[in-house]
């Protein structure tokens, strides 16, 4: 019952100022808060939301644009003065040809693969610790690079979530029919239907709710 007032307040405020809804990361914290209202399957709900966020973020990196993100994020990092040779290697022919190099393309492909695969790895018992280590690795990489427009507390939260939800606990797949219909409905809508509509009609669905953080309508 304690989680319902914040959810109700968010639902009331959001239509009047949608910035509140996006700044609150309702597509992540809001879904998780709702899952906590169900004592019998809260852990499953939190795990599914986290897997959905990772998978959506990974899929949104697919395409030719993400390699430019890797180059610019690395070059604008506070750590940039410590790795000049690496930064030059990210360009095809620094300083005359600033296009992403093969190294940059490989790094972007690895980042895309890592974030897309970390959810399934965490959900599968024998590989869950590998998934946790992978999650800690790429969230730490993003955090220490301090990229523009990136919410760093989200990376810290995801690292904590990886350890607690999949390191401390195994994937809590409930028996068939054990998930409350309300929770199942919200998870289906929030993690499948809304992102699918957002992929088909990106101008109509906010990029966070469509799980398009790297391909969104900012």
Where are the predicted features?
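Alpha-helical membrane-anchoring segments
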Residues: 1-218
């Amino acid at each position: 019952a304690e989680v319902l007032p914040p959810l109700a307040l968010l639902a009331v405020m959001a239509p009047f100022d949608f910035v509140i809804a996006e700044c609150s990361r309702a597509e992540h914290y809001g879904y998780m808060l709702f899952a906590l209202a169900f004592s019998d399957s809260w852990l499953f709900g939190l795990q599914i939301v986290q897997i959905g966020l990772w998978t959506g973020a990974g899929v949104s990196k697919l395409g030719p644009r993400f390699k430019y993100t890797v180059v610019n994020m690395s070059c604008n990092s506070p750590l940039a003065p410590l790795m000049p040779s690496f930064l030059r290697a990210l360009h095809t022919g620094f300083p005359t040809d600033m296009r992403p190099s093969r190294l940059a393309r490989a790094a972007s492909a690895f980042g895309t693969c890592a974030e897309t695969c970390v959810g399934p790895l965490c959900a599968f018992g024998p590989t869950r610790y590998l998934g946790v280590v992978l999650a800690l690795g790429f969230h730490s990489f993003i955090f220490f690079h301090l990229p523009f427009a990136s919410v760093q507390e989200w990376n810290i939260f995801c690292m904590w979530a990886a350890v607690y939800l999949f390191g401390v606990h195994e994937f809590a797949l409930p028996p068939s029919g054990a998930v409350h219909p309300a929770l199942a409905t919200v998870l289906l809508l929030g993690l499948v239907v809304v992102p699918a509509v957002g992929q088909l009609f990106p101008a109509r669905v906010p990029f966070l709710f469509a799980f398009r953080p790297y391909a969104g309508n900012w």
